[in-house]
């Protein structure tokens, strides 16, 4: 596993080791031991995943920007197993020097990249291919009462979703999230969300 730090602490791009031959390829999509050895020292704490999710979406679908409020916060490790998505993490930790900034990475079935999103970030993605199958690991179970989000269409975030606005397909719930300027974040950079 090769880990790539981004411009925002707590967000990492992970490149798995692929073994290719005439039959195709093989890789470990997740190894708790390797994650603990290589990622934990960067984060400064362990992450223990407990739930795997998978979604299938068509071109233009935009999901996000989601998070779970304390005490049910989630870290995520995400990847695209079929198709292409633009995946984004937005720092929403009050007091963070990168508050409101984002990291975007294209995840595809060909590059096999994974994206680690720290607690205290809003997460979302847009489907760039005809269809996409998206998988993500979470370190806390889903709690609908703690569900939260900021608008995926907030222009002030400066995210180029690579989808024309007239092709964007959002759930009704995602159209109702607040813009960042109207959002009171439940996260603070000085509060350890992993205790």
Question: Predicted regions: what is each one?
Answer:
Residues 107-131:
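Conserved metal-binding segment of the jelly-roll/cupin
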Residues 1-110, 131, 138-195:
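Non-catalytic, conserved peripheral segments adjacent to functional cores
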């Amino acid at each position: 596993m090769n880990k790539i730090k981004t411009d925002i602490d707590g967000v990492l791009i992970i490149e798995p080791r692929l073994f290719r031959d005439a039959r195709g390829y093989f890789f470990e999509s997740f190894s708790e031991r390797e994650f603990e050895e290589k990622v934990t020292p960067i984060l400064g704490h362990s992450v223990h995943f407990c739930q795997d999710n998978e979604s299938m979406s068509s071109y233009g679908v935009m999901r996000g920007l989601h998070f779970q409020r304390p005490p049910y916060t989630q870290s995520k490790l995400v990847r695209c197993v079929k198709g292409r998505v633009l995946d984004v993490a937005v720092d929403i930790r009050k007091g963070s020097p990168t508050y409101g900034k984002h990291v975007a990475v294209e995840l595809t079935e060909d590059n096999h990249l994974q994206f680690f999103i720290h607690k205290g970030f809003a997460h979302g993605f847009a489907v760039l291919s005809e269809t996409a199958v998206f998988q993500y690991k979470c370190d806390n179970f889903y709690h609908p009462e703690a569900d939260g989000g900021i608008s995926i269409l907030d222009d002030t975030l400066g995210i180029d979703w690579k989808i024309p606005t007239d092709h964007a397909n959002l759930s009704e719930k995602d159209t109702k999230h607040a813009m960042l300027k109207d959002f009171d974040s439940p996260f603070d950079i000085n509060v350890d969300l992993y205790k």
